[in-house]
Design a protein with these regions (language model features):
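Residues in well-ordered beta-strands of folded domains
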Residues: 32, 77, 123, 162, ...
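A broad, structure-centric signal for solvent-exposed, well-ordered loop/edge residues
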Residues: 28, 38, 65, 70, ...
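Flavin (FAD/FMN) cofactor-binding and adjacent substrate-gating region
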Residues: 1, 9-92
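A generic, residue-level signal for flexible/boundary positions that often mark functional hotspots
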Residues: 15-17, 49-52, 78, 98, ...
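Active-site substrate-recognition segment that forms the wall
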Residues: 8-24, 110-112, 120, 128-200
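General beta-strand structural signal in soluble alpha/beta enzymes
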Residues: 56-59, 104-106, 136, 182
Length: 200
């Protein structure tokens, strides 16, 4: 599937373009925050087996040892995936795009977008920019009218915190395998350890 192939694509882009973004490809742990969450992971595991995906289902004890927390009911490990520093990855992509001739404009607020005869027209003040493709990647900072976003945006409240660098004892017990980790809760929590040894 496209989702299953995505890590190969991302990590190959990082390697080919020498993007410095703390890449770690040690897999990810999807952790069950409840018994119902564990049922969901078991179902995902069974589906993955049908497609011969490299998934491993861990019970509570194994998950406790891999995460360093006793709060989870189990987890699903996907060895294809990993973690990156997303802003550094984005900057690396921008650098490569510039090397290939792309022009990047900052502080260039788009006032209008329309499509005519298969061509996108984007307006910045009095300037019209024509393109074959248009990627709407405005995050929360967009004020185009509803006809432009066509209901494609969802509000996601998310924040990240970083601890002080973990000491050697903590490093040996909190995500010792350096996997990325997130849970099955509707309001998701995620964990990873960065190159500075901080828990993010």
């Amino acid at each position: 599937s496209a989702l299953g192939l995505a890590p190969d694509l991302v990590f190959s882009i990082i390697e080919e373009n020498k993007i410095k973004c703390d890449p770690k490809r040690n897999g990810t742990l999807h952790c069950a925050h409840s018994e119902k969450g564990m049922e969901y992971l078991i179902e995902r595991f069974k589906q993955g087996e049908l497609f011969k995906e490299p998934l491993t289902l861990f019970d509570k004890t194994e998950t406790d040892n891999k995460v360093g927390s006793s709060k989870f009911f189990g987890s699903l490990h996907d060895s294809r995936a990993g973690t990156i520093q997303p802003l550094a990855y984005c900057r690396g992509l921008a650098r490569k795009a510039k090397e290939l001739g792309a022009k990047i404009y900052e502080k260039s607020k788009v006032s209008q977008v329309k499509k005519q005869n298969g061509i996108w027209k984007t307006y910045v003040r009095v300037i019209e920019i024509k393109s074959k493709y248009l990627l709407l990647a405005m995050n929360a900072y967009q004020d185009l009218d509803k006809s432009h976003n066509m209901g494609k945006f969802s509000t996601v409240h998310y924040s990240q915190f970083a601890t002080r660098p973990l000491n050697s004892n903590e490093m040996s017990t909190i995500l010792p395998g350096k996997e990325g980790c997130w849970d099955t809760a509707a309001i998701m929590s995620s964990l990873r350890v960065d190159d500075a040894g901080r828990l993010i």
